[in-house]
Amino acid sequence: MKFECEKTLLASAIDGVSRAITNRAAIPVLEGIYMKAEGFNLTLTGYDMEMGITTTIECNVLVPGETVLDAKLLSAMVNRMPAGDVCIELNDEGQAKISGGVAEFEIPALNASDYPSLPVTGADNTMTVKCGMLREMIEKTIYAVSQDDKKPAHTGELFVIEPGSLTIVALDGYRLAIIQRDVECTRDIRIIIPAKTLQELLKIMGGADDDVKIDANRRYVVFTSNGYTIMSRLIEGDFLNYESVIPKDKKTRITVDCKTFIDTIERASLVITERLKNPLRITFSEDKVTVRCQTPLGKVLDEFAPVEMTGDPVEIGFNNRYLLDALRYSKCERMVLKINGPLSPVKLLPEDGKDFIYLVLPVRFKNEG
């Protein structure tokens, strides 16, 4: 095998597929990038048995062939090559010579026949949406994905695909994020996609106006965008019936300026550490929102005026980080909080009431038992 490829193009492709590679893989060959040169193209693949990323780039193929090269070494060497073409050549001794300009490296090549094939997913064409829309939907929800492996279904995002709409849901037992958009789709399927897959998709997807094609069935999902194909196994298990936990009623409705609220919470959070944690004690009344917190580091009292409030005054405890995340990831100027009492989940929505819903569970104060 021997081929030549422009350095920047090759380095970008190596970086893209490396996102699917685990440093300490159970199978050593999976720490490498599978490369196949034929015709006028080079196909690169990274795979960890759960997620695979593939891309094809143009190159000058002098001798067709395939090999597997250590991903970390290959990336470091190609990135440090001078500008211009990079040549990779496999010799009969199983060594790969990587050269560019006057620089030359030689590293062991792994046997391509040992590299496991990506599964034939059989995934059906589901929908094509704009990258900008899907990116926004994922970014506004993925922060709420559970980190607890005891509930595997909640370590991913639920995609509810229905004729005409896409809903994405994430939760971790303390908060819930839901976002919905209208799409052109005739399928009806619910799938749970691992958070890691979606995080890597965000890094690889094209620009806001580019398309991302989604193919799915009950076992796999495949995303195609920006010259890359990402294949992922789905998470099996039952996702919480999220619709049943959304409060229907409200006793208190408060509209707040997000920046003002965030600044106030950040000041109160100065006395909170990983070791010294106490909930924020927030009182919502007609003319002001009061934020208090006390830990062994000190105590804070801060307040600001809400934009609008209707209903009963209420005092409620919040985990500072969960409330901050909801406000920050909303990317809204104003948010509406709907509260049904000090121990009920708090619903947060954009001021116009559309697009997405966040739920944050309150924290009991210790003296309330």
Model region roles, listed by residue range:
Residues 1-369:
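Structural preference for solvent-exposed beta-strand-turn elements
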